[in-house]
Every structure is written in structure tokens, then in C-alpha cells.
Regions:
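N-terminal segments that mediate ammonia production and transfer
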Residues: 1-66
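ATP-dependent adenylate-handling active sites, centered on carboxylate activation for C-N bond formation
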Residues: 45-46, 59-267, 277-279, 283-295
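Short linear sequence motifs
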Residues: 9, 22, 243, 258-260, ...
């Protein structure tokens, strides 16, 4: 098995335990990684030659100070609408609709552009999301659409095992119930579908800059841990037998690759490039085991 030839890195494991993802990396293994941010690849089919260059500045763009907020908002709306229009396809379009603003915005854009879609939601076994389902039903009624509500049962051990198998532990196990949701949708649409979600909207809809000025790397590090660490780094480091300082040094070294000297923008960029790209991507990748999924 290929796993027998790979090396688990204790530092990466500790970072994952504290952050729920590994900043700047895609796996726990020393030998396997994802492409660096802003990577461009050119492949020559005739010579079987692959060339790659990384230009992080293409991904980490500092906001232009002084521009009117209304103009920025108009640009965001225009871009958002263009993306939604790109989903005009012959595949059935299923919008996983919750009570949140994110998926509601997608629903509004599709409706405005006369792109047909099926609003679909799940009701968990404990009925903890019943208020979300109620709001989603009201939105569906407003748009004169039939709301497909999928009832979930209590998760079985095989759902957790399947999620671990599919994502090798890189997707949070408590979301195993989402596999049941996807399986039931696939049973209704066995010929495939386009599955749309509002995942990641919290990176667009809210203010990403820190609520206080960060003047240096120490302030950045302390603020990052206070806002994002799930498990204290001291505990994560102890579990995997590494110095806590190693985690700090890794994060700061990775942060130094961001093409900006402003620590406030470094923080916002980290939320987009790390939490969004590492955490949200794994859920998106999970969905694509079942059908085409976009967010």
C-alpha cells in the first residue's frame, strides 16, 4: 500500500489538531503536498514536459485603499452574478438551501437570471436545524418552487468510516451525517446533477481584517491563535512530542511568503488562503465523490 511508503510528519499533525487543517499544506505526509498558492502550470503533450511557477501575488491581492465601498460592492455583485450564470447547464441544478445568507444569495442570483434550480435541504435526526429548514421552505415558496427536504437518520458507524476513507481524516468527522444527505440526493438523481452550496460565503460576507491593529509577527501569532485555534498549541505539541515553538516558527515562516508587509492584511489573506482553501475545500472535495459540486 502507498501509505506504507509515506511518512507522517508530527509537526503537520500538531498543526492540524490545533487548526483543523495544515496552513500552507494539503496533507499530513512529508512526501505529499498540494500546489503552492498562485501556481501556474504549463504542460506540453508532445514532450510530456510539465513546468510550474508560483506567483502568490496573483492570489493575495491587497485591497485598494480609498476606493468607494459602494463601487467595491457593485464589483462583487457583478462577479457573483457572472459565476452564477456560469452554472447554466443541462444538469439538474440542486441548491442546498439553508437559512443562512450565503445560499440565499445564490438562490436570489439564480432566480434573477432565470436559471432553474431545485431547493434542497436536510433535516437532521435531532432536528437541530429545523429553523433553517423553515426559512429555506419560506424562500422556496417565495420563488414558487417545490422544496425537497431530506430526512436524515442517526449516523451509523459506517458513515464515519466512509468519510475517513474518502478524506483520510482531512474532513471533520462530525460532518459524517452530510454523507447520508449526499447519498440520498444521489439516489434521487442517479444520472448526476450540479450541487450548489453557499459554503465559503462567510469569507465574503463578513469583514476579514482583525478587530485591532497587528503591528508585528508576535501580535499576529497571538491574535491568530486566539481567533482560530481549536486546541491550544501547547497541548497539540505535547501530544505529538514536538516543541511548541516549532509550530510558531512554521506559521511565521509560512506567513513570510505572503506578498504584503501589513500584518492586518496578512491575517485577512490567511483566513482566505488557509481556512477557506484548506478547510472549506475538503468539504467541497468530499461532495465531488458523489456529483459535480460548486460553491
Amino acid at each position: 500500500a502507498i501509505s506504507d511508503q509515506l511518512t507522517l510528519n508530527p509537526l503537520f499533525m500538531a498543526l492540524y489538531l490545533s487548526n483543523a487543517y495544515i496552513p500552507g499544506r494539503g496533507t499530513f505526509y512529508q512526501e505529499i503536498d498540494t500546489l503552492a498558492s498562485g501556481t501556474f502550470a504549463i504542460y506540453d503533450w508532445l514532450t510530456d514536459d510539465l513546468q510550474m511557477i508560483s506567483q502568490p501575488n496573483m492570489r493575495f491581492v491587497e485591497p485598494l485603499a480609498g476606493r468607494a465601498e459602494k463601487k467595491r460592492l457593485n464589483e462583487l455583485v457583478e462577479t457573483f452574478m457572472d459565476v452564477c450564470v456560469s452554472y447554466r447547464t443541462k444538469l439538474p441544478k440542486l441548491l442546498s438551501l439553508s437559512g443562512g445568507m450565503d445560499s440565499r444569495c445564490v438562490a436570489g442570483a439564480l432566480q434573477q437570471k432565470s436559471i432553474d434550480f431545485v431547493p434542497i435541504s436536510f433535516l437532521d435526526f435531532q432536528k437541530e436545524v429545523k429553523d433553517d429548514v423553515l426559512i429555506a421552505s419560506q424562500i422556496a415558496e417565495l420563488y414558487h418552487k417545490s422544496h425537497n427536504v431530506i430526512q436524515l437518520s442517526l449516523c451509523e458507524p459506517e458513515h464515519y468510516e466512509k468519510l475517513f476513507y474518502l478524506k483520510a481524516g482531512l474532513n471533520y468527522l462530525p460532518v459524517a451525517m452530510f454523507l447520508q444527505y449526499l447519498e440520498k440526493i444521489l439516489a434521487q438523481y442517479p444520472q448526476s446533477a450540479l450541487f450548489l452550496t453557499g459554503d465559503g460565503g462567510d469569507k465574503v460576507m463578513r469583514y476579514l481584517l482583525p478587530d485591532k491593529e497587528l503591528a508585528d509577527e508576535k501580535q499576529w501569532l497571538n491574535y491568530w491563535y486566539s481567533q482560530n485555534a481549536i486546541i491550544p498549541t501547547k497541548d497539540s505539541a505535547a501530544i505529538f512530542g514536538i516543541p511548541e515553538k516549532a509550530m510558531d516558527e512554521y506559521l511565521l515562516n509560512h506567513l513570510s511568503t505572503y506578498p504584503t508587509g501589513n500584518y492586518n492584511y496578512k491575517y485577512a489573506s490567511a483566513i482566505l488562503a488557509e481556512r477557506s482553501a484548506r478547510w472549506a475545500f475538503e468539504g467541497e472535495d468530499r461532495n465531488r465523490y458523489f456529483f459535480r459540486s460548486e460553491t
